[in-house]
């Protein structure tokens, strides 16, 4: 019996979650981890040498600033410079008019905090306003702790140094000296996806989880944005490279479910698979060299027949369309997104969000001022950091912050008791800190769902052991106060966000599902013919479906944390939503299979068949918001012409009918198990 079998199921699931998160494969993760690790050690060396205070803040700047590629790091560095100017300006404004008057100081700081939190949710550059909000709140602790205005001004001026020198450091490391370019990461990512595709094409492998496929598809889209902004050649041949990304995503996601043992291994099929794998290898070599791939392969009738027999014709045609595309094809002009959210000034949730954050901060400020316990001022920072648009995401951030703070506090306690008494110089300190910072950097560069644990762990550790001390420290009170401050801020935020204007996603989730199914119906209306425009449209919408399904999955996870909802209603909503997501993914792959057979069918028959499916799906999606959707019932008419031309298509479309019938009935009090059907529609 393995050790895992003796552990409770929740513990096993937690360990599996962390294993999945920490072992994430992502181009650029190792360079980002090394840059962050080296940057942390340099910050400690510089701060200790020149006795620069607020070392934890400098480390936080690094963890938020060093990104996965050089362009993104440079962009964030510019934002940090702008944010630093705004932060210090707002602090001096507050101090000038209200240094000795706590009430007036809060009256001035309150609107600044509310404005920053409002803009953080509605503006594209929300990170800047988040940083301003953090400093505006953190700066309120200076006058309360010190009675000397001159010292407070000096500390505030030190904040400029504390914020800007790590920004300069990360620019030197991540942009000038050891840049990790987005274009190189894109080439590596495309080759990795094609390697996985070839493995599934030639061997019978277990399919990867759909969530992983969708996240890697989204990662390619993000890299495409960075490449477009950072590489001139990519901009020149943008249309070809975008088509390449879409094609690779399609091949990778489709072959993930492909099982070569499901088809007869005739000589023609074996030779065709070898030829297809050879063409994919040629595409890999061209991508690795940064060249646009061109193919002279023309499919013969025997190869087309073999491709149709093993359900690879659509993949083959999609690949060849890319190989025959002109690299200098002009790109489609992209619409520039607005800087503000469309409903920024009409949706009251944004202002309520800002008011809730301010209320939580004021409660924490009143508490720690009333009990005269300045060491727990981290509770105010916690209220701003864990403020998220909805209850579920706020709870997620609270768990991450508490978990990171707990790990950081334990490390700080062990470090203070067992290691600090044996240290004599800065070199020994750096050697001891190196593994701690490396662990924090590796966690911080993992998945977005858990990366904040690494940041919080290192910042909490630094606050307790390195903050404003330039020699050995043995004060355990700091560790206690920082941890308690985070716990208090988390509890206050949980109460406020749960009972004061709670923003639940329980109503948004069915609407999100409806939008996703609407995209799927658009896919079904695209003519199933190997025409260039139709294929490109199909691939682009398909990528959008990956993003939509992933967003629905994440929203389900957040709704599961909304404990203010009735437990039975929440469980039923999540069960139905997950069933819709699962069936939607299966419908997408089943519809892919029909493309391989539909080309031989008369064009006049296809719009009627596809329209029948699309209409049923749109009708089902329209009733999700009001919980009036019933499982679609579709019956296909088997015409002699279609049976004579290609009976395989009818079987594939009957499978689509079965998937339609398994969609949950939202009018029923509980989910009923789906039944297997031979011909599709009728239950």
Swiss-Prot record:
Main localization, broad class: membrane
Keyword tags: Antibiotic resistance, Cell inner membrane, Cell membrane, Membrane, Transmembrane, Transmembrane helix, Transport
Entry annotated with the keyword Transmembrane: yes
Cited Pfam families: FUSC
One cellular-component annotation, GO: membrane
Compartment(s): Cell inner membrane
Subunit structure: Could be part of a tripartite efflux system composed of MdtN, MdtO and MdtP.
Function: Could be involved in resistance to puromycin, acriflavine and tetraphenylarsonium chloride.
Protein family according to the UniProt entry: Belongs to the MdtO family.
Protein name: Multidrug resistance protein MdtO
């Amino acid at each position: 019996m393995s050790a895992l079998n003796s552990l409770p199921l929740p513990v096993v699931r937690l360990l599996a979650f962390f294993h999945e998160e920490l072992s994430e494969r992502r181009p650029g993760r190792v360079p980002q981890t090394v840059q962050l690790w080296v940057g942390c050690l340099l910050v400690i060396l510089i701060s200790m040498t020149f006795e620069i205070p607020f070392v934890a803040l400098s480390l936080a700047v690094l963890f938020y600033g060093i990104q996965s590629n050089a362009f993104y790091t440079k962009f964030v560095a510019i934002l940090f410079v702008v944010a630093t100017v705004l932060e210090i300006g707002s602090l001096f404004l507050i101090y000038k008019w209200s240094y000795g008057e706590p009430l007036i100081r809060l009256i001035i700081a309150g609107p600044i905090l509310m404005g920053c939190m409002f803009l953080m949710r509605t503006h594209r550059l929300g990170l800047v306003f988040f940083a301003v909000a953090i400093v505006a709140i953190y700066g309120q602790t200076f006058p309360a702790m010190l009675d000397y205005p001159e010292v407070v001004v000096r500390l505030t001026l030190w904040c400029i140094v504390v914020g800007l020198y790590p920004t300069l450091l990360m620019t030197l490391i991540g942009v000038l000296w050891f840049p990790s370019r987005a274009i190189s990461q894109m080439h590596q990512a495309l080759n990795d996806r094609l390697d996985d595709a070839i493995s599934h094409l030639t061997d019978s492998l277990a399919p990867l989880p759909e969530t992983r496929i969708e996240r890697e598809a989204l990662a390619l889209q993000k890299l495409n944005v960075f490449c477009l902004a950072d590489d001139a050649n990519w901009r020149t041949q943008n249309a070809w490279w975008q088509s390449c990304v879409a094609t690779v995503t399609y091949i990778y996601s489709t072959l993930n479910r492909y099982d070569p043992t499901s088809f007869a291994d005739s000589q023609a099929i074996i030779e065709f698979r070898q030829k297809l794998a050879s063409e994919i290898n040629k595409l890999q070599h061209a991508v690795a060299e940064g060249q646009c791939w061109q193919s002279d392969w023309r499919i013969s009738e025997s190869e087309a027949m073999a491709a149709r027999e093993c359900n690879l014709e659509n993949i083959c045609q999609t690949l060849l369309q890319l190989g025959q595309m002109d690299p200098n094809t002009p790109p489609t002009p992209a619409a520039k997104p607005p800087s503000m959210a469309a409903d920024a000034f009409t949706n009251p949730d944004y202002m309520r969000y800002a008011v809730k954050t301010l209320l939580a901060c004021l409660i924490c400020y009143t508490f720690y001022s009333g009990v005269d316990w300045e060491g727990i001022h981290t509770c105010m920072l916690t209220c701003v950091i864990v403020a998220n648009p909805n209850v579920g995401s706020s709870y997620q951030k609270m768990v991450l912050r508490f978990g990171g703070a707990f790990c950081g506090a334990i490390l700080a306690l062990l470090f203070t008791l067992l290691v600090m008494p044996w240290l004599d110089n800065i070199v020994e300190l750096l050697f001891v800190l190196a593994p701690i910072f490396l662990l924090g950097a590796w966690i911080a560069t993992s998945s977005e769902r858990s990366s904040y644990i690494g940041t919080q762990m290192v910042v909490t550790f630094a606050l307790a052991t390195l903050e404003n001390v330039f020699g050995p420290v043995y004060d355990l009170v700091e560790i206690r106060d920082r941890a308690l401050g985070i716990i208090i801020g988390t509890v206050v935020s949980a109460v406020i966000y749960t009972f004061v204007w709670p923003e639940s996603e329980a109503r948004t989730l069915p609407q999100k599902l409806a939008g996703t199914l609407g995209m799927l119906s658009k896919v079904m209306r695209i003519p199933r013919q190997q025409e260039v425009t139709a294929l490109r449209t199909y691939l682009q919408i398909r990528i959008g479906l990956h993003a939509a399904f992933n967003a629905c999955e994440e929203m389900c996870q957040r709704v599961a944390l909304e404990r203010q909802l009735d437990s039975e209603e929440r469980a039923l909503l999540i069960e139905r939503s997950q069933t819709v997501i699962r069936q939607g993914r299966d419908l997408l792959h089943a519809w892919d299979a029909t493309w391989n057979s539909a080309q031989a069918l008369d064009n006049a028959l296809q719009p009627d068949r596809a329209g029948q499916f699309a209409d049923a799906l749109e009708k089902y999606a329209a009733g999700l918001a009001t919980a009036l959707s019933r499982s679609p019932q579709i019956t296909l008419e088997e015409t002699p012409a279609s049976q004579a031309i290609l009976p395989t298509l009818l079987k594939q479309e009957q499978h689509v009918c079965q998937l339609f019938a398994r969609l949950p009935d939202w009018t029923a009090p509980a989910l009923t198990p789906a039944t297997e059907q031979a011909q599709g529609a009728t239950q």
